[in-house]
Amino acid sequence: MRVDIVPVGDVPAHVKRQASSSLRSVYDCEVVVASEQDVPTAAYDEARSQYRAAEFIDTATRATSGDKTIAITPHDLFYRRRNYVFGLAYLDGRGCVVSTYRLQTSSDGGFSNRSSSDVFDDRVRKEVVHELGHTLGLEHCDNNRCAMNFSPTVREVDRKEENLCGSCQRTVF
C-alpha cells in the first residue's frame, strides 16, 4: 500500500518526517511526501475563523494517486457542529486530514515533564495513525491505549499509544 502525505499550507519538514516514520512503522507501508498544496480558500468560514476539514481531504486526494492520501495542515479545522477536530477521515475512504493546530502544547492547558517538541511530535504520530486507520476500515476503539481510541482533547491523545491494539491490528492485517 502506498500512502501519500500531502502538506496543505506550510508544514514543517520535521512534521512530515514524524508522520512518514509513524505510518511506515505502524502500517508497514510505502510513504511518499507529495508537493505542498495551497490552502483551499473556499474552505474558510469567516464566522468561525476556521477551515472546513472535508475540503482539505478533497484537495489532497485530487493532488495524488496513492492508495491512501493524508493531508497535513497547520490550520484550525472543524467538521459540522464540532468546535474543532484534530483530523477527519471517511471510513474505508481514500483520504483523510490531520491538523497540527491544536496539537501544539501551547493549546492544551496540560502539563508534562517532557519537552514541548517531543509531546507535539508524539501527538502528530498518533493522529496520523488514527486517521489513516479510519480509511482502512477501523472505527473508534474502546481500548484507551489504542491509537484508534476517540480523543476529543489532547489529554486523551497523550494517554493513548501510537500503535494499534491487538484487536485493531487483526482487523487491518
UniProtKB/Swiss-Prot annotation:
Residues where Zn(2+) 1 binds: 130, 134, 140
Keyword annotations for this protein, in alphabetical order, are:
Hydrolase, Metal-binding, Metalloprotease, Protease, Zinc
State the EC number(s): 3.4.-.-
Q: Which cofactor does it need?
A: Zn(2+)
Residues bound to Zn(2+) 2: 141, 146, 165, 168
Source taxon at top rank: Archaea
Q: Where in the sequence is the active site? A: 131
* Cited CDD domains: Peptidase_M54 (cd11375)
Give the matching SUPFAM superfamilies. Metalloproteases ('zincins'), catalytic domain
Per UniProt, the cofactor note for this protein states: Binds 2 Zn(2+) ions per subunit. One is catalytic, whereas the other seems to have a structural role.
Q: Name the InterPro entries for this protein.
A: MetalloPept_cat_dom_sf (IPR024079), Pept_M54_archaemetzincn (IPR012962), Pept_M54_archaemetzncn_arc/bac (IPR012091)
List GO molecular-function terms, semicolon-separated: metallopeptidase activity; zinc ion binding
Which Pfam families does this UniProt record tie to the protein?
Peptidase_M54 (PF07998)
Task: Report whether Zinc shows up as a keyword of the record.
Answer: yes
May I ask which residue range the UniProt record assigns to the signal sequence? none
Under the subunit heading, UniProt states: Monomer.
The family line of this record is: Belongs to the peptidase M54 family.
Under NCBIfam families, the record lists:
archmetzin (NF033823)
Functional description taken from the UniProt entry: Probable zinc metalloprotease whose natural substrate is unknown.
State the name under which the record lists this protein. Archaemetzincin
What are the leading ranks of the lineage? Archaea, Methanobacteriati, Methanobacteriota, Stenosarchaea group, Halobacteria
Recorded name of the encoding gene: amzA
